[in-house]
Design a protein with these regions (language model features):
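N-terminal Sec signal peptide and the immediately downstream disordered periplasmic leader
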Residues: 2-83, 114, 148-151, 214-215, ...
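N-terminal periplasmic accessory domains that precede
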Residues: 78-81, 85, 106, 119, ...
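Extracytoplasmic beta-strand/coil segments of soluble accessory domains associated
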Residues: 83-128
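Short acidic/polar hinge/loop motifs at secondary-structure boundaries
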Residues: 123-163
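C-terminal beta-signal and adjacent terminal beta-strands/loops
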Residues: 128, 610, 730-737, 758-813
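Transmembrane beta-barrel wall of Gram-negative outer-membrane proteins
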Residues: 188, 201-342, 346-368, 755, ...
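Outer-membrane beta-barrel transmembrane domain signature of Gram-negative proteins
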Residues: 346-357, 376, 380, 386-494, ...
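Gram-negative outer-membrane beta-barrel transporters
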Residues: 599-600, 604-739
Length: 813
C-alpha cells in the first residue's frame, strides 16, 4: 500500500511540475488524443447524456482520439492505434494461438476484453464469436469481447475512450470502461489513404488502401461510405533454430518444412466497409442508419510435428504412442513418414465475417428528445486446417480439414427519452431488449473421427473439429430499464446519478448504480470522481464453448488440451460448477488543470473490485482415472486428453492505478509549432482473498505481475511550413513471464517511432515513418521453446516481429 501511495504522489508531482514550462500561448493543442477532424469535436458522446460536455468538464476520464492521430501511429487498424495512443489500453499480438490469432484480446486498465464495451455511434456492438483461449495470461484468458478491428479507421470522426465503470449507463460488460467509435457524418468530400510497409527483418509486407466518400444527397440528408482493403504477408523469425528440424536436415530427411517454428504474424487479407446515413423527415425528426460488413481470411502456421526422435527431441505428446516412432525397436502400425517424411506444420486458418445494421428514428430538437432503434449483428469464423493429419485414420486420413465454425448473433431493440427541465437539470430514461445466439457449427467427419487406429490420437492434429456432441445453437435473452439524472447544483458543482435494472433469463436480475460529480474550484482547477457498481453475465461462448487443441508442453513436444463446457458431465469429473455473473465496485477520483494557455493535464486514480471473476482455469494434468472417466462418458479422445481447462467463477480481484494525460502546444512562429503529449498509466492487479484451487503461487504471481504495471508514451510533433516531424517513445515497465514453473524476468523496454510528412502538394499528404525504429525484439522464452524454434516470447506485450517501416499517401477531395 505504501508503494502505491508513493507512486500516486510521484505522478501528482510530475503533473504539476510540467505546468511551469507551459507559457501562455494558444488554445489546447491538436496533439495525439485530441480530436480536430472536420465534423468532429471534443464534445463527447459517452459518459454523459448532456450534449454540451467536453473532455475537460466531464465528471469522468475520457480520451478523444482524432483520425489524424490514428493515421500518425503508422497503424492501419484501430487495435494498434489505440494501444499506441492510450496507455491504459492494450491489444496483444499473439503468435500461433488458435482463434486468438484472428481476434486479438484487448485490455483496458488491466481488465479483459469482456469488461470493455464497444459502441459505434453510441450504440452497442455485438460480440466476436471467438473466445480467447490462448492469450497466455491468466487475467485475459477466457474472455469473449467485441472485435475492435472490423471498422476502417478512415470511417471515423473520433474514437472516445471512457476510462471508468459504466454498467449503470450502458449495461453488462462496461465494468472497466467504454470505447465509442463515432462515424463521419459529412455531406460532401472524402479522402483516400494508401500504405505499404514491411518489418525490418521479418518480412510481413503489408499493402493497405482506405477510402471515404460523402455522397451529396441534398441539404437535409447525409450518406457516408468507407472501405478498406488490407493484404498482409506472414512474418517470420530471423533465426529459426528448431533442434529437430536441424537434425532431420542433417540426416538428409526430405520434406522438412521451411519454417518449422511457425510464423510470427499471421497471413491476413480483409475487406472492411461501413455506411452512415440519415435524412431529416422534419425540422426535428431524423431517420438514420449505419452498419458495417467485413470479410477476411487469416492463417497461422503451428510448430513442427516430427516423425521420429531427432536432436534430443522425441515425438512424444500428441504423438506419444510408439507407433509413430520410426526407430527399429518399435513395430509400426502406421508410418508417418509415408505421408510427411520430414514432419509437418499445420496451417490453421479462419474465414472471418462481420456484419451489423442499425436503423433508428430520433427527435433531437427541443427540451424533450427521444431515440428508438433496432440493430442486428453477427460475427462468424469458419475454421480450416491444412497440412496436418488425423493419425487414427492412418494412410486413409486427408491432409486438409474443416473443423467447424463459431457464430455470435445479436438482436437488440432500444428506446431512450430525455427531458431538459432547464439549463441545469436533465432527466433521462430508457429500456432495452437484447437476444444473443451462439452457434457452434459441426466440423467435417474426418476432423473429429476416431479411426481404426484407436490407440493413436483422433481428429485433425493441431485443432480438432467440433463433433455433433459439441455443436449446437444456444440462446440467451436480457431485458433492461435504466434512468439518469444530471444536474448542475451550482455553477461550479455538477452531479449525475444513474441506475439500471437488468433481467437475464439464465442468470437472474441485477441493479447497478453510478454517481459522478465534478467540482470546479477555479477556472484552472477542477476535481472529479465517481462511484459505481457493475455487472457482467457470462457470454454464451463461455457457457457453451469447447475445444480440443494441441499445445506445446514443457520439453518441446505437444499434448492434447481440452476446454470443457462448465458444469457439463465432462467438467464435473474435475469439480466444475455452473457459471454465475460477475459483479464489480468502482471508485475513481481525479483533477483537471487548464490554467495556462496551450496546456491541459488530467490525473485520475481508480480502483475496480470484481467479485466472482470469470476466468479460464489454468491447465491441469489429467490422471489415468480421470481419463478413464472421460472415456466412460464417450467424451471425444477422452483417453488421450492430458490437460483440461474450463470456465469458472474463480476469485475476487482488485485493480488499482492511475492515468496521467498532459498536452501542451508551443508556438515558435506563425508557421512553426510543436505539440507535446504525455500519457502514463500505472496499473496493479491483485487477488482478494485466498487463491482458488489450481492457482499455484506461480500462477498467482503471473496473474499479478504477468503484464507491465507501467505503460506510457511521450510524443512531440513539430510543424514547420509544409513539413511535420513526429517522434514518439512508448515505454513498457518490467514484468514477469511464467515458463512452466519458472519465472523469466522481463526488463522494462522503450520503443521509439518516427514519422516525417509533407503537405506542400494541394490536397495531398505524403509521409514516411517507422515503428520500433531500433528493431527491438522481445527476449526468448525458455529452453523448450528455443528448441522448438520459438526464439522470442510469443506472448510479448509489444509483439515479436521487430521494427516496421512504411510509406503513406493521402489525398483529400
Amino acid at each position: 500500500m505504501s508503494k502505491f501511495v508513493s507512486r500516486l504522489l510521484l505522478s501528482s508531482a510530475l503533473a504539476f511540475a510540467m505546468a511551469p514550462v507551459a507559457q501562455a500561448q494558444t488554445p489546447p493543442p491538436e496533439a495525439e488524443g485530441v480530436d480536430t477532424d472536420e465534423g468532429g469535436s471534443d464534445i463527447v458522446v459517452i459518459g454523459t447524456r448532456r450534449k454540451d460536455r467536453s473532455i475537460t468538464d466531464s465528471s469522468v476520464a475520457i480520451d478523444v482520439i482524432s483520425p489524424e492521430s490514428i493515421t500518425a501511429t503508422g497503424y492501419t487498424d484501430v487495435n494498434d492505434a489505440l494501444r499506441t495512443l492510450v496507455p491504459a489500453f492494450n491489444a496483444q499480438r499473439l503468435q500461433g494461438n488458435d482463434g486468438s490469432s484472428f481476434v486479438r484480446p484487448v485490455t483496458l486498465r488491466g481488465s479483459p476484453a469482456d469488461h470493455v464495451l464497444l459502441l459505434m455511434n453510441g450504440k452497442r456492438r455485438h460480440r466476436a464469436s471467438i473466445v480467447q483461449i490462448g492469450t497466455g495470461h491468466a487475467s485475459t484468458s477466457g474472455s469473449q469481447g467485441q472485435d475492435f478491428n472490423v471498422i476502417p479507421p478512415i470511417a471515423l470522426s473520433s474514437v472516445e475512450v471512457l476510462r471508468d465503470g459504466a454498467s449503470a449507463q450502458y449495461g453488462s460488460d462496461a465494468i472497466a470502461g467504454v470505447i465509442n467509435m463515432e462515424l463521419k457524418k459529412q455531406k460532401s468530400g472524402g479522402s483516400i489513404i494508401g500504405q505499404v510497409g514491411e518489418y525490418f527483418s521479418s518480412g510481413g509486407r503489408t499493402y493497405d488502401i482506405q477510402g471515404h466518400i460523402a455522397v451529396p444527397v441534398g441539404d437535409n440528408a447525409y450518406f457516408n461510405l468507407a472501405a478498406q482493403y488490407t493484404d498482409q504477408a506472414k512474418a517470420y523469425a530471423r533465426k529459426a533454430t528448431h533442434a529437430g528440424a536441424v537434425a532431420l536436415r542433417a540426416a538428409g530427411v526430405p520434406g522438412v518444412p521451411e519454417h518449422p517454428e511457425g510464423n510470427l504474424d499471421p497471413r491476413y487479407m480483409a475487406f472492411k466497409s461501413v455506411w452512415n446515413a440519415g435524412i431529416e423527415l422534419s425540422d426535428a425528426l431524423e431517420l438514420y442508419t449505419f452498419g458495417n460488413y467485413m470479410t477476411g481470411k487469416s492463417s497461422v502456421t503451428f510448430g513442427l510435428r516430427q516423425p521420429f526422435a531427432a536432436g534430443g527431441l522425441s515425438g512424444h505428446g500428441t504423438y506419444a504412442n510408439s507407433a509413430f516412432d520410426l526407430s527399429p525397436a518399435h513395430p509400426q502400425q502406421f508410418n508417418l513418414a509415408s505421408v510427411y517424411p520430414g514432419g509437418f506444420t499445420p496451417e490453421f486458418g479462419g474465414h472471418l465475417e462481420d456484419f451489423s445494421a442499425l436503423v433508428g428514428l430520433r427527435d433531437q430538437d427541443g427540451p424533450l428528445t427521444w431515440d428508438l432503434s433496432a440493430r442486428y449483428g453477427t460475427n462468424t469464423v469458419d475454421y480450416t486446417i491444412t497440412g496436418t493429419i488425423n493419425a487414427s485414420m492412418g494412410v486413409n486420413s486427408p491432409t486438409s480439414f474443416k473443423p467447424g465454425s463459431l457464430t455470435q448473433r445479436e438482436i437488440q431493440f432500444d428506446g431512450e427519452i430525455s427531458y431538459e427541465l432547464n439549463d441545469q437539470i436533465l432527466l433521462f430514461a430508457g429500456a432495452s431488449h437484447r437476444k444473443e445466439t451462439y452457434v457452434i457449427g459441426e466440423g467435417d467427419l474426418a476432423s473429429y473421427l476416431t479411426g481404426p487406429l484407436r490407440d493413436l490420437p483422433a481428429g485433425s492434429n493441431g485443432f480438432q473439429g467440433f463433433s455433433p456432441e459439441f455443436a449446437g445453437s444456444f440462446d440467451s435473452n436480457s431485458y433492461a430499464v435504466f434512468a439518469e439524472v444530471d444536474a448542475d447544483i451550482t455553477p461550479w458543482w455538477n452531479l449525475s446519478v444513474a441506475g439500471r435494472y437488468e433481467d437475464y433469463d439464465q442468470f437472474g436480475t441485477n441493479f447497478s448504480y453510478k454517481a459522478a460529480t465534478r467540482f470546479e474550484l477555479s477556472d484552472a482547477f477542477a476535481l472529479r470522481g465517481s462511484v459505481s457498481t457493475g455487472f457482467r453475465a457470462p457470454a454464451a461462448g463461455q457457457v457453451f464453448g469447447t475445444s480440443l487443441t494441441s499445445q506445446l508442453d514443457g520439453i518441446g513436444g505437444f499434448i492434447l488440451d481440452a476446454v470443457l463446457v462448465p458444469g457439463s458431465p465432462a467438467a464435473q469429473v474435475f469439480g466444475s460448477d455452473a457459471l454465475t455473473p460477475e459483479t464489480s465496485f468502482n471508485m475513481s477520483a481525479g483533477v483537471v488543470f487548464t490554467g495556462l494557455d496551450g496546456f491541459l493535464t488530467t490525473l485520475d486514480f481508480y480502483q475496480i473490485d470484481v467479485d466472482d471473476r470469470l476466468l479460464l482455469t489454468p491447465s491441469r494434468n489429467t490422471t489415468a482415472a480421470e481419463r478413464a472417466a472421460l472415456a466412460a462418458i464417450n467424451f471425444p479422445n477422452g483417453a488421450d486428453i492430458q490437460q483440461v481447462r474450463y470456465f469458472q467463477n474463480e476469485m475476487n480481484t482488485r485493480v488499482r492505478g492511475f492515468d496521467l494525460v498532459s498536452t501542451y502546444r508551443q508556438e515558435w512562429s506563425d508557421n512553426a509549432s510543436t505539440d507535446f503529449s504525455l500519457a502514463l498509466n500505472y496499473n496493479e492487479q491483485h487477488l482478494r482473498g485466498a487463491p482458488p484451487p489450481g492457482f499455484s503461487p506461480a500462477i498467482v504471481t503471473e496473474f499479478e505481475r504477468g503484464t507491465p504495471r507501467w505503460r506510457g508514451n511521450f510524443s512531440a510533433t513539430t510543424k514547420v511550413g509544409d513539413f511535420a516531424l513526429m517522434g514518439r517513445a512508448i515505454h513498457y515497465g518490467a514484468w514477469r513471464r511464467l515458463d512452466g514453473a519458472t519465472f523469466l524476468p522481463r526488463k522494462a523496454v522503450t520503443l521509439f517511432d518516427a514519422e516525417i510528412s509533407y503537405t506542400g502538394i494541394q490536397d495531398v499528404e505524403l509521409s514516411v515513418g517507422a515503428r520500433n525504429i531500433f528493431n527491438i525484439f522481445p527476449p526468448g522464452r525458455g529452453a523448450a521453446r528455443a528448441r522448438a524454434g520459438l526464439i522470442y516470447d510469443n506472448h510479448s506485450v509489444f509483439g515479436v516481429a521487430g521494427g516496421f517501416y512504411y510509406l503513406n499517401a493521402k489525398y483529400k477531395f
